[in-house]
Amino acid sequence: SYEVALLAVNAWFDGVDVVLNEKKSAFTIARPPGHHAMPNYGMGFCIFNNAGIAAHYALTKPGIDRVAILDWDVHHGNGTEAIVAKNPNIAYCSLHEYPFYPGTGADTYQGEYRNILNIPVKGGTTLDLYQHLFEQQVIPFLSQFNPQLLIISAGYDATRADHLANVAL
């Protein structure tokens, strides 16, 4: 429901506050998911883009001018990408199966500010390849951007146990 979606966004705000104020890591478990929600409308079971909203919220805090979002999921976070593409102070990295719903996330798209890294993987991708991609692409991209805050938008549908997906982590 709408009320639950608002509670989820507030949980992400609380997570950002814990990290910035208490210098601790935070883990927010919130439903509905968010990475398909576009700047102006919901999509793909997502009402609000929790990670994108949390990144913008973090940028309002003193001393925070660079936030990165790392998204791993079997689906590309098209909504998060759309939000990040308009803000040079947020970087977005997505590992996702491609081609697959929603049909976005080609590795050629980097955004106007070159702050987007899409890493499409084929169905059947294993943990070994995923780890290699982290070491060779994700970590260098995030290190170069040098964020003061890293937000992880973790999808768990790329596991071997999820029979609706083809990635085998």
Question: What is each PLM-predicted segment?
Answer:
Residues 7-21:
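Conserved ATP-binding subdomain of kinase catalytic cores across diverse folds
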Residues 13, 17, 27-169:
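Conserved alpha-helical scaffold segments that buttress catalytic/binding sites
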